[in-house]
Amino acid sequence: VLVASLVMLEAQSSDTIQVPDWGKRLLMNHDSNRVGIPCGESCVWIPCLTAIAGCSCKNKVCYT
């Protein structure tokens, strides 16, 4: 999440980095009341490796 935030800050302040609108919406407008913040990995075949950081599997995606 911290990395995504830093990428978005860089993308907003730079004219050379182009982030698609859907990417901005996904990173900046998460619905924390429904699921949580995405941890950046799926848990379709293996458990969340980011469980040590507090992530858990919900709907085949790791969330905090």
Swiss-Prot record:
PROSITE patterns xrefs: CYCLOTIDE, CYCLOTIDE_BRACELET
Source taxon at top rank: Eukaryota
Alphabetical GO biological process terms: defense response to Gram-negative bacterium; killing of cells of another organism
InterPro entries recorded: Cyclotide, Cyclotide_bracelet_CS, Cyclotide_sf
Tissue expression: Expressed in fruit, pedicel, root and stem but not in leaf (at protein level).
Propeptide positions: 1-35
Disulfide bonds: C39-C55, C43-C57, C48-C62
Family of this protein: Belongs to the cyclotide family. Bracelet subfamily.
Domain notes: The presence of a 'disulfide through disulfide knot' structurally defines this protein as a knottin.
Record's function text: Probably participates in a plant defense mechanism. Active against E.coli ATTC25922 but not against S.aureus ATCC 12600 or S.epidermidis ATCC 14990. Has cytotoxic and hemolytic activity.
Listed name of the protein: Chassatide C7
